[in-house]
A protein has these predicted regions:
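Extracytoplasmic copper-binding redox domains, predominantly the cupredoxin/blue-copper superfamily
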Residues: 2-9, 15-125
Length: 125
């Protein structure tokens, strides 16, 4: 009697586990969203805009020094483990991918130019 119950239950559990493993096999993490930032005339994207993201969202920043003169810039995100990095000459680009934290406001800045930067707001929609 016990064998009659155990074998069908075991078979169902094995099939369920196989179905879950098969379903999860093809799911890679979503590609990060790309955000392009231009540094020129002591501003990011001309106006130092506020960016809005969702918790857990992966963002790939492509930050380019678009100065027409020999002005060096760098890029950091305070509180997200993205340090200033080396100075970027005009025409150079830095790429950084981050996963947004649960919530909060985070400053993005050029470390060498006070006032050059803005805010990233992480909140649920």
């Amino acid at each position: 009697m016990l064998k009659r119950l155990v074998l069908p239950i075991a078979a169902v559990l094995i099939l369920a586990a196989a179905a879950v493993a098969f379903a999860l096999r093809g799911h890679a993490p979503a590609e990060p969203r790309t955000v392009r930032m231009s540094m020129r005339e002591y501003a990011f994207n001309r106006t130092n805009p506020t960016f809005r993201f969702e918790p857990g969202e992966r963002i790939h920043f492509i930050v380019t020094n678009d100065e027409s003169t020999n002005v060096l810039h760098n890029f950091r995100i305070v509180g997200m483990n993205v340090d200033c990095g080396p100075p970027m000459k005009p025409g150079e680009t830095r790429e950084v991918t981050v996963t947004m934290p649960k919530s909060g406001e985070f400053a993005y800045t050029c470390c060498t130019h006070p006032g050059m930067g803005g805010t990233m707001v992480v909140t649920k929609k």
